[in-house]
Amino acid sequence: MTLKFVKKQNEVGDVWSFFFEPLEPVDFVAGQYLNLTMPGVPPAVSDRLFTIASAPHEPLLQFTTIIGPSHFKQKLNSLKTGQEVEADQLGGDFTWEAVPSALSNDGVKRLFIAGGIGITPYLSIIRYLIHKQQPINATLLYAGKNEKRPFVEELHTAVEIDPTLIIKEYSETRLTLEQLKKDVPNVEHYIVYLAGSQAFSEALGEGLIEDGFPRQQIKYDYFDGYVDLEY
């Protein structure tokens, strides 16, 4: 599919959002990803997976990322309005709807854990549920330095709209397994979603599993290329 670049906006620090108009309808589920192919970039590094930050009902596709020195990121950051990029490989089960078959989707508790830019799939899900006027019924643990955590104000507004969304923020202290279990003492009753750098997500996920948490109740969305959180 072809996407036409519309605009970019700074979210916080070196975190930017890029907005594209799809030239054909994109039928996706909140929390899924697309692969973008950047023109003018060597083939070996011209592709990258991005979680879609926008919700399915929104007219533009939003991708949010940290702008670094890579050839791909620099090309993305230099796109002009009207330029086109190709997208494919729509997929992913890091979604509200995808829960283990042994659990009922009605009334299931969800624990969203985000490290920095890993907030994007949750943003898509939260926007979608608010649009549908469907209770979120989730706890979000959001970790990372303030200059690495976009959309904080929007998330606070979401809590005002729907108090069934509970947010705990970790900007000064590291979110460890011990802190997680302290802040969510009945974590074994949740489906746990983990999104962020591989090191961040695996440290918490594997720690839970070692404590006896069912592996099938953990969902991962790794953000390749990002180092562990900075505090």
Where are the language model's segments positioned?
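Ferredoxin-reductase
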Residues: T2-E84, D88, G144-N146
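FNR/FR-type flavoprotein reductase catalytic core
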Residues: G68-Y231
